[in-house]
């Protein structure tokens, strides 16, 4: 990575990095706009600014560029000036997740822009690199590399990480059942010919929930 100041940025908080491979060849660029500010859209996301493309006849090559946007708390001002921006573990997960999308976009070797990087990838498959990256924020070695106490500099204690993992995994089977509900409903819905109308759609969803869900769903619930 090479932090570059000589590029256009839409705010002073934005950082731009050029990305090189092991042969020191430039392969892309990555914008980071990580901190909340007035008027900025909420949430966190990664978007491709331009995709990798190469014209075989002329040899013209366009390198991928993407940007990651988040709304982390900026470094404090006033009496606390000089202190760093602090992230919760959930925010670290967000950082790793969106960074995974960025790597997916930047590390592509596909030369057709419409299907390079995150372009043209099914919505379920496009989440694979990002969710894979989240695992490093739960791994002891990964946490030891990136965590520091703001005052003492100590890494996150192993006991605290184990407590966080226990909380994460508590009733995690319920999350799996929820995903099974989505998957079965999707498969059954798209197998219907002709397409069901709204009452039939709700009846189909209720039948899936009756097979999969442990907790009953309120009768007034509307899937959205």
Question: What residues fall within each predicted segment?
Answer:
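Cation-handling catalytic/transport regions enriched in His/Asp/Glu
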Residues: 1-224
């Amino acid at each position: 990575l090479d932090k570059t100041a000589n590029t256009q940025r839409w705010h002073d908080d934005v950082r731009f990095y050029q990305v090189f491979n092991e042969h020191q060849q430039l392969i892309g660029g990555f914008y980071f706009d990580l901190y909340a500010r007035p008027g900025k859209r909420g949430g966190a996301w990664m978007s491709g600014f331009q995709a990798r493309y190469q014209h075989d006849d002329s040899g013209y090559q366009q390198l991928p560029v993407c940007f990651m946007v988040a709304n982390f708390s900026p470094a404090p001002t006033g009496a606390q000036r000089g202190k760093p921006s602090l992230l919760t573990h959930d925010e670290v997960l967000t950082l790793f997740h969106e960074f995974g999308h960025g790597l997916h976009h930047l590390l592509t070797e596909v030369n057709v822009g419409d299907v390079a990087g995150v372009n043209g990838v099914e919505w379920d498959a496009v989440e694979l690199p990002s969710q894979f990256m989240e695992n490093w924020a739960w791994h002891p070695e990964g946490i030891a590399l990136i965590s520091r106490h703001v005052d003492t500099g100590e890494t996150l204690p192993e006991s605290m990480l184990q407590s966080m993992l226990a909380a994460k995994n508590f009733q995690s089977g319920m999350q799996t059942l929820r995903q099974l509900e989505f998957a079965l409903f999707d498969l059954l819905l798209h197998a219907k010919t002709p397409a069901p109308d709204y009452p039939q759609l709700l009846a189909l969803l209720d039948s899936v929930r009756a097979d999969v869900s442990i907790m009953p769903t309120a009768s007034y619930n509307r899937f959205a």
